[in-house]
């Protein structure tokens, strides 16, 4: 007699000849009983004879049953690509049911372990149990559905289908279009779905996620190569904020070779002085009044043939031709200088108004003066930078050709809405302002304050102005800056009886016309100049860069450099004029760019360093990424080449392979990253093959013709 837990006792046997029998298990019952099972009350203590007989009957039944098949070990996900040996579906059914039953703790098992005296006996029908085989192993017969049990018996006799990791493949020689086969195929789909769900649940539980591998949001699948990047594509929603290209893309400074540098500095006489800092290439002669002698003399073998288009710069006059570019630059500079004088005058008036508002303790007048002072100072800053840039451009010998006026665009921005932090409650203490800048144009919205008496449950602020920018280039960028300041609180003095009597006495003793008889010591203009310049109290709390691609209705964007109380997003409406279809064409491919040598040893040996990039020609600019996947996933390009700043009349293949690469061509650009310094650089590129070279040259030259037509 085997030992068993004292808390569980065997059931009482039924009379001989009954149609039902009891089954007792030494291990806890963890399965779901059938619907026709009935329960018996706990057996009282003291009936030792009946307990011994019942135990002998149950132990004899367990010895006749075969042991359950061993559970196969589930392989880890690392070996998932290795195909397991083919096995029949019927052999997997008891394993899956056993694994599922081991993880599930039934209420009967809980009741068994909680210390109830006696055994809960489950009664099964003896007719079905004696006639049907035990498909589920040591588990009750009613735990397996009827369809799956019959299908497993049929699959043991004849194998019609073969299941693998990908799906269910049908053997063509054993399958015919009959009603029985169709029914079997439907039942097989049900079986495969049950087995697949059980395997997926086990794989998910056994999988261990690595924190480092999940930081970049990349997911590797067994059917995808490891070197291919797969990003989780989220569905685009108009309410979801977007990121914009915050800084303007620049031409790589390390690419190519410098040709000429132009720097602008102020001379001793007070006027601007243009100086050429570096000239690495001899200038090409423009014209001369005296041609070369002996032009018709036959050349010698040692001398190169004469170039009839070459000539020397004439020493008679300083200008060999009319320089329209210099004339236009002077006109623009004169207009800017006049605008600078007006801006400085407006700054003086705004400072004087601000001082008066602070003395009179008028908050609304102080906010208006602060707004005008901020706008004028920002406008003066960009105007001075533009003047320095134009002064440096006047000495450029071959400036870029002018752009067609049809490519000038107009953009209107309206309904700017800022979102507040959810913890922001002091609405009456701040005033907000939005400032927009593009080259020398500076526009701003009105000052909006959130007064305490107008508190609403909405946690955003709306600017209803329409701001318009015109005469914009193809690759324009508009900078948006959000400013805030604390609203000055000027509380009126308390009117006590003593203060009221003192004011009455002062009015009686001092005559009303005493202020008119006071002598004026200085003029208002001199007082404005002598007064100290007050500081602007508006503080930058967020910025954003807008371009042509950011136009649309109800667009949401993330802000940069956000501080409290802003939440970090902005919603606005923007509309921009469309470009002609000819400039909107796209051309893609790989290009190699020559970079400068970083180490002194490589510079001494003149070892060329080529880098391969994925390139896109679109809207008059060539954008560069490291791989094509970066463009697909809308990552920010590494740099760009702006063809509007190209000084070449046309792009052609280089005749000499100076850097040891085939299919070369170069583009000369004017780079003005610093307003006081303009550099002319030659960017050397190379294509993959001759066909790619011809395609790139054709696409770039067509773009230049469209821009300059």
UniProtKB/Swiss-Prot annotation:
Stored SMART domains: PH
Gene Ontology cellular-component annotations: actomyosin contractile ring
Example GO biological process: septin ring organization
InterPro entries reported for this sequence: AHD, Cytokinesis/Rho-signaling, PH-like_dom_sf, PH_Anillin, PH_domain
SS bonds (residue pairs): none
Record-linked Pfam families: Anillin, PH
Domain PH, residue spans: 584-705
Gene3D superfamilies in UniProt: Pleckstrin-homology domain (PH domain)/Phosphotyrosine-binding domain (PTB) (2.30.29.30)
Alphabetized PANTHER family for the sequence: ANILLIN, ANILLIN/RHOTEKIN RTKN
UniProt-recorded name of the protein: Anillin-like protein 3
Lineage: Eukaryota, Metazoa, Ecdysozoa, Nematoda, Chromadorea
Gene name, Swiss-Prot/TrEMBL: ani-3
